[in-house]
A protein has these predicted regions:
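Adenylate-forming
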Residues: 277, 311-340, 369-390, 410, ...
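C-terminal boundary motif of the adenylate-forming
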Residues: 303, 308, 342-368, 407-410
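Conserved ATP-binding loop and adjacent catalytic segment of the adenylate-forming AMP-binding
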Residues: 105, 177-183, 195-197, 201-208, ...
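Structural core segment of the AMP-binding/adenylate-forming
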Residues: 1-12, 26
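Conserved ATP-binding/catalytic segment of the ANL
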Residues: 42, 256-324, 341
């Protein structure tokens, strides 16, 4: 009785319609747009996850606006591969599909997502930055294993793509010779690469949930993939700002989304008000009052500003933005995203608030570094051994030096150049409480857990003893 075949369910529906033709209309009439539709939980980056109560109006109004914004139609095809408990997938793979009527495909399993992407070829795609980082790492590993002719061709045409790919995507003018070269690159490199990524048919792709490194963002757009940034929260039913076609910038997250009001508080915190604003935190009136003002403004906890084009730029979490001892701004997430652009760096945590200089914890990407080690005849027995190898340290130091050169050119952040770093002996893990389940860094916990290592970075110590407890699930 608890498990029915679909045919049985359809037959029961037909019988009900015959017995009571007005049942459906009456059921709809009893409901209200303010009724609770779903309770989704925050990631818990700043503490215990909170249940965000969203109404039917929250979901439907924002989803209709989103479908209209990027011309999402019933002909659209998408792949739902992220947890539906996350607001991003809940909106893009359920609510928007409900109002626009497009086809949502589900992968056979988590292990077949890439294969399913290639087979389905979605034209509407959403993923957090970590997904795009992992895909880029996979591409770079494959290129390093390729023959010298393929490597040379890849790097040459990627140079062309970086120079003119974004302009071509935005329908801007480029020299005929560059357009011709880009066309050859599309045939020989970009097209096959997009097909390998399952993105050959993507018309619009979004990323959100974490800031994405400008270099990573520009890489995908240079291939002709219409990747756009949006800024949102669970509390907003996703949408706060969104980038419009032709107004895409790597350093901003777009202008206010339709029906969204945006303002910046005196302390630099971003606030918004919209039809998507959540009803309350489930059974947590204190947190609700702290986050949502009586007149409906939501405090995001993020620091940012609106530039002269009306686009929002997020600097960092408001509570994380600090000052170095020389009075200059220190924005850890901004620096970490630059570090994570490099295929050999999987995760980074930076320190500098109330310090004389900036430092960093680094997690290497084991797959990428192992591939590099094999090509350089370096043997190792596991993560800890390869992470402590002198040549691996030199590899990571080279990445950090390039980031420092970039920071040196920014008048606001030149004091944030990284002077000392540690390659951690273990990977940061959600099971150990160091990351959230969406792989966001939990800074407070890391600072408490690895306090002796942080102290060592700001002393003359060359060696320090550390004991770690690892959880396996």
């Amino acid at each position: 009785e608890l498990v029915l075949s679909f045919e049985t369910l359809e037959e029961r529906g037909r019988q009900l319609a015959e017995r009571d033709p007005g049942f459906l209309d009456q059921a709809i009439e009893k409901g209200s747009g303010t009724d609770t539709a779903v309770i989704l939980y925050t990631s818990g980056t700043t503490g215990t996850p909170k249940g965000v109560v969203l109404s039917h109006d929250n979901l439907l109004i924002t989803s209709r606006n989103a479908a209209k914004f990027d011309r999402i139609t019933p002909d659209t095809n998408s792949l739902a591969y992220l947890p539906m408990a996350w607001v991003g997938d809940n909106i893009f793979s359920f609510s928007e599909a409900f109002v626009a009527g497009f086809c949502v495909n589900c992968p056979e399993s988590s292990a077949t997502v890439m294969q399913d992407m290639r087979e389905i070829g979605p034209d509407f795609y959403f993923g957090p930055p970590r997904i795009f980082e992992n895909l880029l790492t996979m591409v770079m590993i494959r290129m390093e294993d390729a023959g010298w002719i393929k490597r040379k061709m890849f790097h040459y045409f990627m140079g062309v793509a970086r120079r003119v790919g974004g302009r071509i995507l935005d329908h801007q003018s480029v020299y005929p010779w560059d357009r011709l070269l880009y066309g050859v690159g599309e045939l020989l490199v970009f097209g096959p690469l997009k097909n390998a990524l399952g993105m050959s048919r993507v018309r619009v792709a979004y990323t959100a949930g974490e800031a994405i490194g400008p270099e990573l963002f520009d890489f995908y757009r240079s291939l002709g993939i219409n990747l756009k940034q949006l800024y949102g929260q669970t509390e907003a039913a996703v949408f706060v700002t969104m980038q419009s076609d032709g107004e895409v910038r790597s350093e901003t997250v777009g202008a206010a989304f339709p029906d969204v009001e945006l303002k910046i508080a005196e302390n630099g915190e971003v606030l918004y008000r919209s039809p998507g604003v959540f009803q309350e935190y489930y059974k947590n009136p204190q947190a609700t009052a702290e986050t949502k003002t009586p007149d409906g403004w939501v405090k995001t906890g993020d620091a940012g500003y609106v530039n002269e084009e009306g686009h929002l730029r997020i600097i960092d979490r408001a509570k994380d933005v600090g000052k170095m001892n020389d009075g200059s701004m220190f924005a850890p997430k901004f620096i970490e995203n630059k570090l994570k652009f490099y295929q050999y760096i999987k995760e980074a945590v930076t320190f500098g608030d109330q310090k004389d200089y900036a430092s960093a914890f680094i997690n290497i990407d084991l797959d990428a570094v192992a591939n590099w080690a094999e090509r350089n005849n370096i043997t190792y027995g596991g993560y800890q051994e390869i992470a402590s190898h002198d040549k691996v340290r030199g590899l990571i130091e080279g990445c950090i030096m390039e980031v420092n050169e970039n920071l040196a050119a920014d008048s606001h952040l030149r004091s944030s150049q990284i002077q000392r770093f540690i390659i951690l002996h273990k990977e940061l893990d959600a099971d150990d409480g160091e990351l959230t389940r969406t792989r966001k860094v939990r800074r407070r916990i890391i600072a408490e857990k690895y306090g002796t290592l942080i102290d060592a970075l700001y002393s003359d110590q060359q060696h320090v003893k550390v004991e770690s407890q690892v959880t396996f699930e």
